[in-house]
Amino acid sequence: MVAALAKWCTDTDTRLTFFVNGVNTSWTDNAPALAPMVESGQVQLGNHTWSHPDITRIGLDAVADQIRRNGDFLRTTYGVDGTPYFRPPYGRHTADTDRVAADLGYTMVTLWSADIGDDRGINEAQLVANAQQTFQPQQIVLAHANLPPITHCLSQLSDIINSRGLRTVTLADVFS
């Protein structure tokens, strides 16, 4: 999935932010394709923990380890650590987990305002219908790089973006 999304970004000049779990080997396997886009700023990487646990159900030391380990992975693999952006798995976080993240440099807990639902095993038609509803101005749209349907309708997603006069941006484009 990461390979297809990287190719889409290359082919269409799409700008976006990926929140990475380093345990998924696709991020290592596709680093040669993604690294130039990360270096140029076309693609931004944020920290999404090493292995995607519900951080509200593990101890704070384990939360720190998850964030630190993933930051180390990002730094070693891509030359960036994802700071200041952290997206807690499942969107679940507490004031304590936010403090742990902030202590490690991740001061921007980043959630989303719209979700295309691609992580729930929907088919391509449902995904495109969801994109029709959620691709609106000034939205942070949640999508995933782990199930095939999204890779089969990237051109349709581009068409929705372009037909509405929207443009994709990274978080740094907006908040820097």
Q: What do these predicted regions represent?
A:
Residues 1, 20-30, 54-58, 87-93, ...:
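Acidic-and-aromatic substrate-binding clefts and catalytic sites of carbohydrate-active enzymes
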Residues 1-54, 60-62, 66, 71-76, ...:
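Active-site beta->alpha N-cap acidic-glycine motif
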Residues 3, 7, 32, 61, ...:
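Solvent-exposed, polar/charged alpha-helical surfaces in well-ordered, non-transmembrane soluble domains
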Residues 4-13, 26, 149-176:
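C-terminal domain-boundary segment and adjacent tail
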Residues 16-20, 44-47, 84-88, 108-112, ...:
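Structural recognition of the beta-strand scaffold that forms the well-ordered cores
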Residues 76-92, 98-104, 148:
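Basic- and aromatic-lined ligand-binding clefts that recognize polyanionic substrates
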Residues 92-134, 166-176:
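His/Asp/Glu-enriched short active-site or ligand-binding loop at hydrolase and phosphoryl-transfer sites
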Residues 137-139, 147-150:
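Periplasmic-binding protein-like
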